[in-house]
Amino acid sequence: MRRRATLAKVMLGEPILIGRDAGGAPFALRDPCPHRGMPLSAGRFDGREVECCYHGWRFDTGGRCTSIPSLVPGRAFTSEHIRTRSYPVREVQGNIWVYFGADPASAPEIPALDGFAGRSPDLVERITFSAAIDHTVVGLMDPAHGPFVHRAWWWRSRRSIQHKSKAFTPSPFGFTMSRHAPSANSRAYRLLGGMPETEIIFRLPSVRIEHIRAGRYRVGNLTAITPVNKGVTEIHHCVYWTAPWLTALKPFLRHYVRAFLRQDGRIMQRQQQGLRYDPPLTLIDDADTQAKWYYRLKREYRRARAEGRPFENPVKPRTLEWRS
């Protein structure tokens, strides 16, 4: 996002105006003007204040109303008590994170990729799924759908199903698939050369981080899943790398990432046709254990907050085995 730019978003059902001021600092405000509900994003931003396009009311980046042009001087009414909600924001590794909680001091730690401090993504792709947050998270962490959903000459085929065994350990607010050599049927990793190793981390509420190492080179993938509303989610997939030749391959990599995400999007869309009948669902051991952990993590987080106690990770070290 450029300086003096704004962007209208809906996150967690809330209309949000995200912007970057003249000094480069990000901010987030509730979008509807508290006067007559006109989206502030439809107005003008000069790098310091947002001006509503309807009556010219102005708000600073902290949400405080600074000017009401229609007010007559000397009247008792002033703009000082008028505000639109301001949300705490932080920018980490080129991503802007918005906190919706009531107490900014209780905001969780922002997820970051090791080895890319101060870096912005080399490639970013975004896609919207017509699916609820839980089904989207479970769908993207599911290890067994690859040969059926992600069939492609450059990735894998249905005939490439293999037995897999991966070690998992608990990690902050989630779990980690321990460092391992990528499966032989995952061809894209070969672009890095050498002997690549990958580690995959999931943490609440809905963030997946993959660290890939091949000799002295690193690739990092950060996937963040944001609920737009109860039935729609937005996926942001950010890729970082240190291998210089990957920059030359960026058009190919973008095509690959888009194709991969669209395949997931299509399968999510089809799943909704069955889910609208609220069928009973079955999670099996090993292949679906990560999904079980996700629901357990959510329940424990809610209980810990309600009881005012520290979060206790319910995930225990375990090796999972499946075919994919």
Model features per residue range: what roles?
Residues 1-116, 321-324:
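Rieske [2Fe-2S] iron-sulfur-binding domain
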Residues 25, 104-324:
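C-terminal catalytic domain of Rieske-type non-heme iron oxygenases
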